[in-house]
């Protein structure tokens, strides 16, 4: 497992995110991760696991912390982006399609 998302390696999954210690963190259960991996594999979706960033190092803020506050088991997923928030962001067509295909598979499961 790489510590970063790679372009052309499929939809990016992030098991844990956070800041401010445990108060702003989320960590998906092993059962949720296994379920999502199974659904994606059965749908022939290319996926990768990686970190979103170092805790308290800035960046990497998602809505996962708001879900975790309500005790909702949360797994971040999305398109890996190079140079996010820069004038020119770069994404892969394959990653976009695999994210679409993966989300569709999860909703249909």
Model-predicted regions and their roles:
Residues 4-88:
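Active-site-adjacent substrate-binding region
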Residues 1:
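Active-site loops and adjacent core secondary-structure elements that bind or stabilize anionic groups
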């Amino acid at each position: 497992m790489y510590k970063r998302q790679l372009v052309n390696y499929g939809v990016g999954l992030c098991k844990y995110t956070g800041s401010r210690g445990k108060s702003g963190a989320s960590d998906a259960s092993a059962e949720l991760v296994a379920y999502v991996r199974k659904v994606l594999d059965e749908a022939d979706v290319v996926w990768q696991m990686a970190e979103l960033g170092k805790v308290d190092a800035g960046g990497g803020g998602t809505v996962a912390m708001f879900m975790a506050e309500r005790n909702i088991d949360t797994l971040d997923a999305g398109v890996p982006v190079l140079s996010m928030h820069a004038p020119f962001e770069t994404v892969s067509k394959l990653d976009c399609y695999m994210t679409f295909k993966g989300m569709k598979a999860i909703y249909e499961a």
